[in-house]
Amino acid sequence: MQLTDLTMLELAAKLAAGEVSSEEATRASLTRIQQVDPKVRAFLRVDEAGALAAARASDVRRKSGSPASTLDGVPLGLKDIFLTEGVETTAGSRILEGFVPPYDATVVRLLKEAGLPLVGKLNMDEFAMGSSNESSAFFPSHNPWDVSRTPGGSSGGSAAAVAAREVFGALGTDTGGSIRQPAALTNTVGLKPTYGRVSRFGVIAFASSLDQPGPMTRTVADAAALLQVIARPDAQDATSADAPVPDYSADLEAGVRGLKLGVPREYFTEGMDPEVEAAVREALREYERLGATLVDVSLPHTKYALATYYLIAPAEASSNLARYDGVRFGLRAKDARSLRDVYALTREQGFGAEVKRRIMLGTFALSSGYYDAHYLRAQKVRTLIREDFTRAFQQVDALVSPTSPVPAFKLGEKVEDPLSMYLMDIYTLPCNLAGLPGLSVPCGFTKAGLPVGLQILGRPFDEAGLLRIARAYEREHDFFRRSAPL
Amino acid sequence: MALTLEQVRHVATLARLSLTPEEEQRFTTQLSAVLDAVEQLQSLDVEAVEPTSHATLTSSRLREDVTRPSLPPEKSLANAPAKSDTSFAVPKIIE
Amino acid sequence: MPVSDFQPVIGLEVHAQLLTQSKIFCGCSTAFGAEPNRNTCPVCLGMPGVLPVLNQRVAEFAVRTGLALECTIRPTSVWSRKNYFYPDLPKGYQITQFDQPICEHGRLVIDTPQGEKAIRILRIHMEEDAGKSVHDAGGGQSLVDLNRAGVPLLEIVSQPDLRDADEAVEYLKAMRDVLVYLGVNDGNLEEGSFRCDANVSVMPKGSTTFGQRCELKNLNSFRFLKQAIEYEIARQVDVIESGGKVVQETRLWDVNKGVTRSMRSKEEAHDYRYFPEPDLPPLHVSAEAIDAAAKALPELPRAKLQRFTSQYGLPAYDARILTAERPLADYFEACAGHYKDYKKLSNWFLGELMRLLKEEGTPLSALRFTPAQLGELLGAVDQGMVSANAGKDVLGEMFRTGKAPADIIAEKGLAQVSDTGAIEAVVDDILAKNAGEIEKYRAGKKQVFGFFVGQVMRAMKGKGNPALVNELLKKKLGD
Ligand SMILES: [Zn+2]
């Protein structure tokens, strides 16, 4: 077994015992990246010097018996959407190529304070708009389980890097499923916390009312440990929540006996891959064996979620992306001679097709004469979708469903058909519209060896409950021990 | 609903995107398809429904009126495509 | 139809910069005059990833202003984004309030030749200022300075209740007085920290349908406001008279030419695409907070002016000057606690004190003497212990050194001689030396009397009590 095969907590235990140093772990991670990343292409940028310096500082703390946290010294990767002071951050876009932030995102600061070496920036769909990583302006990442397939998106690079054991864990962001869907497609754990649980300050915005950063790890316990580091109120984020942060590992092993798990009818629909359905149904039976009660529930407005999402998210994005104008940072079109050109040519050359498509859609949805019928109506339907969940959680403790309707698909398969790509998120995006926490945990493989993910959705701020439910399943099925055939 | 080419051009102007003729055509088709798909929302009766603009109903977090250090101008302008002394520079604005 | 057959209709939009230390959504200083982009940070530069957090004083100031202008305060007001591209607007949108502003439905009472008139306030909202672009920077470039970006503003929008340029000026002055009194704004039109746009239209007298309006900008003095409105009224009447139609547009006041001119913007029609700002939760203002703000509200200029005329019996002219600025009014009231001849006190304020303040450029807050000391000085003048003229010198010395009036009078030997015997001796001496002048006086040349007074005062180094000197001279000269 290689060092990089360890989970975060296993490594942390060895670091604490002095059996291995953070520098060794970080070097192992960097070596693994050298070996497999040419195939996986998860990284946009590796910060070897920064990571090793942080690792050595961690080793000094460990030696002096004053680690900064339990995860002190565990190397981590960051989706390239998190601003890192002095380290180029692009959100997968040409328009930010060469942009070196003057400040750290709040979560990056928290990770640094907790002593985690940050080995580099991970590939993503441009501005997190996509479900396959193919909208990255630089190159698509590949799924370690089948490199001809997508690792999912938008946090595809993060999921691929964790699955390929290039890093021990990573941070992603989830606007409509961007943490959970790639986790499901790569046999990893992805947790999207409750909106407001983790600070968005320094996280490049896609859709402000939906975006939420979260952990992407190999195991449920790692996700709990990483969430523990980043979940807290932030004075620099007016939407961050004051709700107390519990100990996420306290009830991890408490099991599901006596819990009521809702199975939403609308999440088992036509178009779902039969093998995905089979794996998920089997997981549901496992929960019954473990003592949980399955309850048939209905979320009647689910069928409107996709339309609602594809009005609200692009509308917010069209405004959030107005700052990329060639004036203060990032790209400015070389041939821009007038102010009008600085704007229109820079944005034309700097944004990719998917980003332009969504800016166009969002601009239209907000424009005079169309606002009421599109944006405002979508916000009202959003209320109905939230109320569906509120009613369901009066009956059950959590909801269980597939994370993605299909396993990893071939790169290039859906690029020319935006609508079929948008359908990849149908089970994940209602959770974002309602601001709820959601988690994807590995629940098996298809015959072709492609991972399948089980999604668990919970009440606001019940991340601990989701982790406990996921862990109960994981204890019986340690799929995370399987390594991808690289 | 089907978008016209004119509408696509108007929206591109609002969004400051200098689309190529091919993009204008492609977006006209693709956006029309998306707008057709979202048309289903029109069938819902939302007359009495309050809109949700924020995912969670947190109360507003405020800050005290105290100054904090600004960035030194060399850092503020470090990423600027064009500058003059400590100002950002753009092609002359014609009013 | 002549101009007099048309009724102008005017509404003003006031933009007042709030007197906070830091910007509305970040900790950068609001100080004026720094090197370009010295007061900027990732937030006000609109860098990727940044989020706004509201400066709570901005909300406090908005509530205070709303209450002073008799507005309804919304318990929950909503932030919106106004989307447009401009180099001095870093994020590509301005954070402002749109359909649910913090204050609505207020009024401000002004004086017109026909008496008092209440101008209705439509709404007050909070927003961030934009930066500054310098267009004539040379080299075919414009330069962008974002020091002003994110400075907090209140926008106060009146209903179109104003009927001529004088009313507009009166309204703007009254508004400035209120904001300055509240301590939320410095009232400086020249520097642009208090500025206004005017919406002007005309309609035939007797009509109830407003004409098409034009928005006037660049009105950075009361004089320009008046001139621009008067010009614009005449222009619109001309357009209508010559069979044309007024086009709704924004027009700039050209200070040099004395005309308003159309800002023929090549920009496409604006579509601001307002929508609720997802980065800022709605602002909640509790009933308790509103009550507390109402209780803490200072007396406003108009109420104070009325009280000064009734309580102190002052003429309206005096009261207006004394209440024009709150510190002066407060100081007057403090002095009135120590000196009861209010009109005489007012004279000293309007005369000597204001002259000294102006000449020395001293703010009232830096005065070195106490209201009790000023009362003491005026008492001494009344009692003849020091002459009115010498009293002015004493006040000057108090102003510069902060010494007590009695000490200054003693040190400088300014005490007035009111001892009849001492004065009589000097009078006798002067008369004895000027027998010829006495002859002239007695022969009817009465102006010689002034000569005697002057001689006596000079001999007494100006300290003789003038009333006594006069009285004794008249007696001795046999009048
Ligand atoms: Zn700032």
From Swiss-Prot, chain B:
Q: Which HAMAP family match?
A: GatC
Q: What is this protein called?
A: Aspartyl/glutamyl-tRNA(Asn/Gln) amidotransferase subunit C
Could you give the subunit structure recorded for this chain? Answer: Heterotrimer of A, B and C subunits.
Function according to Swiss-Prot or TrEMBL: Allows the formation of correctly charged Asn-tRNA(Asn) or Gln-tRNA(Gln) through the transamidation of misacylated Asp-tRNA(Asn) or Glu-tRNA(Gln) in organisms which lack either or both of asparaginyl-tRNA or glutaminyl-tRNA synthetases. The reaction takes place in the presence of glutamine and ATP through an activated phospho-Asp-tRNA(Asn) or phospho-Glu-tRNA(Gln).
- InterPro entries xref list: Asp/Glu-ADT_sf_sub_c, GatC
The family line of this record is:
Belongs to the GatC family.
Top-level taxonomic group: Bacteria
Q: Where are the transmembrane segments?
A: none
Q: Which organism is it from?
A: Myxococcus xanthus (strain DK1622)
**A single GO molecular function term of this UniProt record:** glutaminyl-tRNA synthase (glutamine-hydrolyzing) activity
Quote the EC number. Answer: 6.3.5.-
Keywords, sorted A to Z: ATP-binding, Ligase, Nucleotide-binding, Protein biosynthesis
PANTHER family on file: GLUTAMYL-TRNA(GLN) AMIDOTRANSFERASE SUBUNIT C, MITOCHONDRIAL
Q: Name one GO biological process term.
A: regulation of translational fidelity
